[in-house]
Regions:
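Conserved acetyl-CoA-binding loop-helix of GNAT-fold acetyltransferases
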Residues: 85-88, 94-107
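Short hydrophobic/aromatic beta-strand or adjacent loop that forms the aromatic wall/cage
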Residues: 50, 143-149
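A conserved beta-turn-beta hairpin within the catalytic core of GNAT-like acetyltransferases
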Residues: 71-83, 93, 141
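Short, well-ordered beta-strand micro-motif
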Residues: 54-56, 67, 148-152
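Conserved active-site alpha-helix within GNAT-family acetyltransferase domains
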Residues: 111, 115, 121-145
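Short amphipathic alpha-helix that is part of the acyltransferase structural core
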Residues: 1-39, 43, 47, 52-56
Length: 154
């Protein structure tokens, strides 16, 4: 069973930056450069945003991850920061890894004085089970309407 100690902040593991960017790119199609740029910004940011987190298996393979960015490609910049790119590899699902990551990142944001977090998704019910509340529908940059969730971090 994984615990919070198994979550790594990519700032603390520069040797994983390229591999993590490739992994996220493969899941979401966002350019590797965009992930690398965001991770480079995270290294100099004092605010806690952006930030990138992962869980590795015993062999060092990335099995889950997520990020925190200002805006996850939607037209409501006032609803920030955004948890983004939440992904757990199929063979590792239903073991609480996404919930573990979500709780961890909210704790990290709270430590930085950020009291609210948002995320967009097409999923229903999952985020409610993780303690998030449906907030509103928002328009993505593509024009598609998606669900916006909110959570108080502390």
């Amino acid at each position: 069973m994984f615990c919070e100690a198994d979550i790594i902040n990519l700032n603390d593991h520069p040797e994983l930056t390229e591999r993590y960017a490739q992994w996220q790119h493969g899941k979401w199609g966002v350019s590797v450069k965009a992930y690398l740029d965001s991770m480079a910004e995270a290294k100099i940011s004092q605010s806690g945003v952006p930030a990138w987190y992962a869980i590795l298996d015993r062999d060092g393979k990335i099995i889950a991850g997520l990020g925190v960015i200002e805006n996850d490609f939607h037209k409501r910049p006032d609803l920030a920061p955004n948890v983004c790119a939440v992904y757990v590899e199929e063979g590792w699902r239903k073991q609480g890894l996404a919930r573990l990551l979500l709780n961890h990142v909210c704790g990290e944001l709270a430590k930085k004085g950020i009291h609210d977090a948002y995320l967009i998704t097409t999923h229903e019910n999952f985020y409610e089970r993780c303690g998030w509340s449906f907030h509103t529908m928002v328009e993505e940059d593509s024009g598609k309407q998606v669900r916006m969730y909110h959570k108080h971090t502390s």
